[in-house]
């Protein structure tokens, strides 16, 4: 019996709308609809794997290489002091890297934030794209 698709699989398959920063044949980068920090993004491999250490080496290396590309763009786009990363899979059982742009004077508290409008997410995505 096939398990029901996760929300990330539905987004990847374009069954649920999302604001995309980047997409290729291996991964997507999305603006987080419920950010703990403004400008938070998600790097999600297209292959549905629950636990980061269950990824094959190629996909593991790829999502971290993608984080290395996205992080500096976020740093510039949001004038961040640092861009922090956290690999997760708790709320959605599909590996994803959460990228948090942390600005001067801010601290990072890990939680699911309030829903943000698509207009704000599109604006933020375009800022990041401008530095890729």
What are these regions (language model features)?
Residues 1-132:
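HIT superfamily nucleotide-processing domains
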């Amino acid at each position: 019996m096939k398990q029901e698709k996760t929300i990330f699989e539905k987004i990847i398959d374009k069954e649920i709308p999302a604001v995309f920063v980047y997409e290729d044949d291996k991964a997507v980068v999305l603006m987080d609809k419920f950010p703990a920090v403004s400008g938070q993004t998600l790097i999600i491999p297209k292959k549905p794997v629950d636990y980061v250490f269950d990824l094959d080496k190629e996909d593991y290396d790829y999502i971290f290489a993608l984080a290395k590309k996205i992080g500096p763009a976020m740093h510039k786009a949001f004038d961040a002091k640092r861009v922090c990363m956290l690999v997760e899979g708790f709320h959605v059982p599909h590996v994803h890297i959460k990228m948090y742009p942390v600005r001067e004077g801010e601290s990072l508290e890990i939680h699911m934030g309030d829903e943000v409008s698509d207009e704000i997410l599109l604006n933020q995505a375009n800022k990041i794209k401008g530095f890729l």
